[in-house]
């Protein structure tokens, strides 16, 4: 069976020898300079999958894709299937009272996730680690924007000054402990430009269905690892102690020096079953070809807004959809720290 029309079940039944030959043949047919690297068995949260890696070089940097099997798959989530822990129920109840939300955690989850459905998803190659939509460019001290940002951001911290539309670049402003200011420009671009650029490379954005399938890899639970979430820290923290240290750092005006403690829970940071580093930071979302045009986070809204810990983790749910978030417009700037580019390659 050709890789062009195989399903997850077909892939699992294929012998290593046949799988290797098919992947080598696929690599030879690709115009992207990717080479078939290897087959590796990968375990994630009690499930096992054989991953096919395809590697290449771009500007001297390693880029890596994996083969995502397709076929008829189950997507979406039904809130009544969620089995919350007592701690999750308690966390949500506090948030529901504070923000006047539906008091039922399962009903609320149902409104925040895409509906259960069956879809036919084609097999494809998909990038392991999403990249920045546009690379950063250093800004010279004599540039007028350098002086403006130096006056606006005097504190010793790293911030991003965002542009919202084409022509409004974003700037990363970092002041080192010795007072040295570093400014980098992130050129603005739009979804239209991104998709045109990908098309020239023989690549594309994944659709919502493809992204959801690649993220959950068949997991029927709310999150790809299960239903559970930590009860005393957010996805951007390594543990409760780390969260406390970051709060102290903010209160010190960025003067406190500390090292992040070791992670005590990191299922969201591990490669998922298909071998992807995906949906691990609510502040960052992957661009997609349809629907809301970005999945995998909420721009950090729940965390930044001070919502409870369960709501802070919810945007990492495989089928998460924010009903209050507007769809990204084609003319909107997407080259910022909130959006990432995860490229897909069709197997035609």
Protein language model annotation of sequence segments:
Residues 1-51:
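Charged, compositionally biased non-catalytic regions
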Residues 36-107:
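Extended, Lys/Arg-enriched charged tracts that mediate electrostatic binding to polyanionic substrates
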Residues 61, 94-219, 274-275:
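Short aromatic-cysteine micro-motif
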Residues 62-65, 70, 116, 121-123, ...:
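Extracellular structured ligand-interaction cores
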Residues 68, 173, 180, 184-309:
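Functional-site microenvironments in short loops/helix caps that host divalent-cation chemistry
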Residues 78-79, 137-140, 226, 297:
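Short, solvent-exposed loop/turn and secondary-structure capping segments
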Residues 130, 288-291, 347:
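Short beta-strand segments enriched in hydrophobic/aromatic residues
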């Amino acid at each position: 069976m050709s890789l062009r029309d195989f399903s997850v079940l077909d892939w699992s039944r294929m012998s290593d020898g046949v799988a290797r030959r098919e992947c080598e043949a696929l690599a030879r047919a690709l115009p992207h300079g990717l080479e078939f690297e290897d087959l590796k068995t990968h375990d994630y949260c009690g499930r096992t999958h054989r991953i096919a890696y395809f590697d290449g070089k771009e500007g001297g940097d390693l880029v890596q894709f994996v083969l995502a099997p397709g076929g008829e798959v189950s997507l979406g989530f039904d809130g009544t299937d969620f089995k919350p822990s007592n701690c999750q129920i308690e966390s949500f109840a506090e948030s529901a009272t504070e923000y006047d939300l539906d008091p039922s955690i399962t009903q609320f989850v149902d409104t925040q996730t895409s509906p259960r459905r069956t879809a036919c998803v084609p097999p494809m190659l998909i990038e392991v680690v999403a990249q920045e939509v546009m690379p950063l460019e250093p800004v010279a001290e004599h540039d007028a924007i350098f002086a403006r940002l130096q006056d606006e951001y005097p504190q010793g911290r790293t911030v991003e000054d965002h542009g919202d539309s084409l022509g409004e670049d974003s700037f990363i402003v970092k002041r080192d402990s010795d007072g040295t200011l570093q400014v980098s420009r992130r050129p603005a671009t739009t979804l239209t430009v991104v998709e045109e650029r990908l098309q020239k490379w023989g690549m594309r954005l994944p659709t919502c269905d493809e992204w959801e399938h690649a993220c959950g890899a068949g997991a029927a639970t709310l999150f790809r690892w299960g239903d559970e979430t930590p009860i005393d820290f957010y996805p951007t923290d390594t543990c409760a102690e780390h969260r406390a240290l970051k709060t102290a750092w903010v209160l010190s005006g960025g003067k406190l020096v500390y090292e992040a403690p070791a992670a005590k829970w990191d299922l969201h940071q591990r490669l998922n079953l298909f071998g992807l580093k995906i949906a691990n930071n609510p502040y960052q979302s992957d661009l997609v070809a349809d629907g809301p045009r970005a999945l995998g986070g909420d721009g950090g809204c729940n965390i930044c807004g001070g919502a409870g810990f369960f709501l802070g983790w919810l945007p990492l749910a495989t089928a998460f959809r924010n009903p209050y978030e507007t769809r990204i417009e084609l003319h909107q700037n997407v080259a910022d720290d909130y959006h990432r580019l995860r490229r897909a390659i069709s197997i035609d």
